């Protein structure tokens, strides 16, 4: 898979030009980075989801933060759009950065749990999607 960060584009512009199918959230709480583990996986990843038909990216972001993670207070901001190519298909996503200030009860979702780390995992074997998530993480916290 190949990740391409798309620069110089606003959130409203990207939503008008391409069909966004995924959102990814690089989150921090109490100066620690948030990662999640999916059921059945022993690796970590950035929180994210597919944008379902009829849903806009703002609703998908809220679904991730509130519905999947149990976040009750946050400040989220658009970072950039990105594309992921698997050799034949291209999918577009939006990267957000979120400052989490309050958490509620962890909902029953497809996640095993939420993990807070001082630094991102160094070893690629600890990431579910090292070819994309590591670069998205770096982009989110570079700015």
What does each model-found stretch correspond to?
Residues 28-68:
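Conserved Nudix-box catalytic region and its N-terminal flanking loop in Nudix hydrolases
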Residues 81, 94-97, 124-131:
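Short helix-capping/turn motifs at alpha-helix boundaries
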Residues 30-32, 99-104, 119-120:
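Short loop segments at secondary-structure junctions
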Residues 1-24:
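Acidic, metal-coordinating catalytic segment for phosphate/diphosphate chemistry
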Residues 71-80:
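A short coil-to-beta-strand element that immediately follows conserved catalytic motifs
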Residues 107-143:
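Nudix hydrolase/Nudix homology domain
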Residues 18-20, 28, 88-91, 109:
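A generic fold-level signal
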Residues 82-106:
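Active-site-adjacent beta-strand/loop module that shapes the phosphate/pyrophosphate-binding cleft
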């Amino acid at each position: 898979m190949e990740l391409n960060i798309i620069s110089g584009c606003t959130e409203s512009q990207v939503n008008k030009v391409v069909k966004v199918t995924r959102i990814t959230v690089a989150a921090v709480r109490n100066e620690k980075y948030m990662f999640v583990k999916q059921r059945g996986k022993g690796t970590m990843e950035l929180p994210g989801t597919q944008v379902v038909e009829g849903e806009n990216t703002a609703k998908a972001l809220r679904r991730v933060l509130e519905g999947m993670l149990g976040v009750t207070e946050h400040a989220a901001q658009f970072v950039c759009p990105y594309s992921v190519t698997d050799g034949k298909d291209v999918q577009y996503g939006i990267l957000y950065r979120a400052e989490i200030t309050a958490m509620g009860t962890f909902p029953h979702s497809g996640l095993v749990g939420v993990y807070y780390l001082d630094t991102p995992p160094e070893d690629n074997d600890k990431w579910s999607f090292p070819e994309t998530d590591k670069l998205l993480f770096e982009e989110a916290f570079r700015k």
